[in-house]
UniProtKB/Swiss-Prot annotation:
Its cofactor is Mg(2+). It comes from Archaeoglobus fulgidus (strain ATCC 49558 / DSM 4304 / JCM 9628 / NBRC 100126 / VC-16). Its EC number is 6.2.1.5. The keyword Magnesium applies. It catalyses: succinate + ATP + CoA = succinyl-CoA + ADP + phosphate; GTP + succinate + CoA = succinyl-CoA + GDP + phosphate. One of its GO terms (cellular component) is succinate-CoA ligase complex. It is an enzyme of class 6 (ligase). Succinyl-CoA synthetase functions in the citric acid cycle (TCA), coupling the hydrolysis of succinyl-CoA to the synthesis of either ATP or GTP and thus represents the only step of substrate-level phosphorylation in the TCA. The beta subunit provides nucleotide specificity of the enzyme and binds the substrate succinate, while the binding sites for coenzyme A and phosphate are found in the alpha subunit. Heterotetramer of two alpha and two beta subunits. The lineage of its organism: Archaea, Methanobacteriati, Methanobacteriota, Archaeoglobi, Archaeoglobales. This is Succinate--CoA ligase [ADP-forming] subunit beta 1. Substrate binds at N255. GO terms for biological process: succinyl-CoA metabolic process; tricarboxylic acid cycle.
């Protein structure tokens, strides 16, 4: 789950990272009052959960309360990358001498928690890495031992930090990692980290948490806004279905996250575009679970075919087949299915589906391998 900028800043401030003074407004009149309270010179920032707000016109400066009102009037109601702006953050303008970058992420290559920092801030870290790779500094550390002070000092010395900037950067890196571990975050980021005459401030803030850890952090779960979630993902979450909407036209259902991702990869290799990730989870003893998964995938109007890839150990293929039949009986529309059943009672499951297809006219294609299934699904999707 990604938090809004103003929510992330509240958490950062709670942990001792300085942030600009500001408040959230949902109307131009509110924005005007907040700007007056802050002295007139403010920045009005769209609060939506996508990047690129500035380039899309969602971040603008104002030099008076009246101008803040006019700017807010333009930003509120805007649609940026499919997200409608319902609120803005109005905060004091900063006199920035420099802009730095600092963030925490779990690096997928090293599989280690990693601090990334740079003297070049205000742009995407990927852009910095592409144009100025030497400007990016990384600290990999052992999650069992945590981030050691000497590791941070060594990295900052190598990057050329000294004096007061060294002290403040050290402090912010340590606090950013503390926040990440306290909230089980996948990402904590300050970009830009503003260097002002008064010290370092988080001019922008990001905090992405792990959805699977939210039950341990009810205070974060309460911040989730239904309007900012993909409707299909929200419905799946409420039903307990492990689903991610991807926007392609080949629906994917597999029993296991690894199998689902491998299926998606091969669909991509075959020139197709997966519509979703869906992991049914283990067991599938209850046919209703399979039924609900298939019906949910079919709610995406872009889906033209569904590839069902099942490897059955504890799972029994006849229960999977029963769930597919239940779904097809209820489905509001018909799409072709590509089905690969392997494992416990696969012959029984296949016979059930073949009989149903023959009697009801359902278009079900059976395959023997994941490659054959992906190829067939891409072909049917057109």
């Amino acid at each position: 789950m990604r938090l809004h900028e103003h929510q992330a800043k509240q958490i950062f401030a709670k942990h001792g990272i300085r942030v600009p003074r500001g408040e959230v407004a949902t109307s131009p009149e509110e924005a005007e009052k907040i700007a007056e309270k802050l002295g007139g010179r403010v920045v009005v920032k769209a609060q939506i959960l996508v990047g690129g707000r500035g380039k899309a016109g969602g971040v603008k400066k104002a030099n008076s309360p009246e101008e803040a009102k006019e700017v807010a009037k333009k930003i509120l109601g805007m649609t940026i990358k499919g997200h409608r702006v319902e609120k803005v953050l109005v905060e004091e303008q900063l006199n920035m001498r420099k802009e730095y970058y600092v963030g925490y992420v779990v690096d997928k290559s090293s599989r280690l928690p990693t601090v990334i920092f740079s003297r070049m801030g205000g742009m995407d870290v990927e852009e910095i890495a592409a144009k100025h790779p030497d400007a990016i500094h990384r600290i990999y550390f052992d999650p069992l031992w945590g981030l050691k002070d000497y590791e941070v000092r060594k990295a900052l010395f190598r990057a050329g930090f000294e004096g007061e900037e060294f002290k403040q950067m050290f402090d912010i890196i340590k606090k950013l990692v503390d926040i990440a571990f306290a909230y089980e975050a996948e990402l904590t980021e300050i970009n830009p980290l503003a260097v002002t005459d008064e010290g370092f401030l988080a001019a922008d803030a990001r905090l992405n948490t792990d959805d699977n850890a939210l039950y341990r952090h009810p205070e974060l779960a309460e911040l989730r806004e239904a309007t900012e979630e993909d409707p299909l993902e929200r419905e799946a979450r409420l039903k307990g279905i492990n689903y991610v909407h991807l926007g392609g036209n080949v629906g994917v259902i597999a029993n296991g996250a690894g199998l689902a991702m491998a299926t998606m990869d091969i669909i991509n290799l075959m020139g197709g575009k997966p519509a979703n990730f869906l992991d049914t989870g283990g067991g599938l003893a209850d046919p209703v679970k399979m039924k609900n998964c298939l019906l949910h995938v079919l709610k995406d109007p872009n889906v033209r075919v569904v590839f069902i890839n099942i490897y059955a150990e504890i799972t029994r293929c006849e229960k999977v087949a029963e769930g597919i039949i239940l779904a097809l009986d209820e489905a509001p529309r018909k799409v072709p299915l590509v089905v690969k059943l392997a494992g416990t009672n696969e012959e029984i499951g296949r016979e059930m589906l073949e009989r149903y297809s023959s009697e009801k006219g359902a278009e079900i294609h059976f395959v023997e391998s994941i490659e054959e299934g992906a190829r067939k699904a891409v072909e049917l999707a057109g």
